[in-house]
Amino acid sequence: MIRAISFALGKTWEEVYRDLAEQGIENGLMLNDRNNWKLYLKVLGYNMERMPKTLNNKRYTVEQFADEIARKGCTHIVKIANHITVVKDKKLYDTWNCKNKCVGNYWII
């Protein structure tokens, strides 16, 4: 989670770790609590976009999201089950291949 956020924001891993730790202490949240990192993005001015659905009301995979929804020249933090990943300039960046996972909510950075 810290890796994805730091990559998307262009910050160091240590900077994001410290920011999340301090915010977590202030709000009584664990460092990796989803409410903590969602609040972090909100405080920085990034709004959560709702989970996209296809015309037949199915969820997009990360690969489909990158091809069809992600904006060229933009960075997106994408929530998938128990994980967040980054799509930057329509390309997936992660330590493992999660292109077949379903997309939840996302943030445009």
What kind of feature is each model-predicted range?
Residues T12, T61-F65, K90, D94:
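Short, solvent-exposed coil/turn linker segments
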Residues L92-I109:
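Noncatalytic regulatory segments and standalone regulatory/sensor domains
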Residues M1-E49:
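Active-site nucleophile-adjacent alpha helix/oxyanion-hole segment immediately C-terminal to the catalytic cysteine
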Residues R71-T95:
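Catalytic nucleophile-His microenvironment captured as a short glycine-rich beta-strand/loop
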Residues V16-L20, V78, V103:
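Generic hydrophobic, helix-prone segments enriched in Leu/Val/Ile
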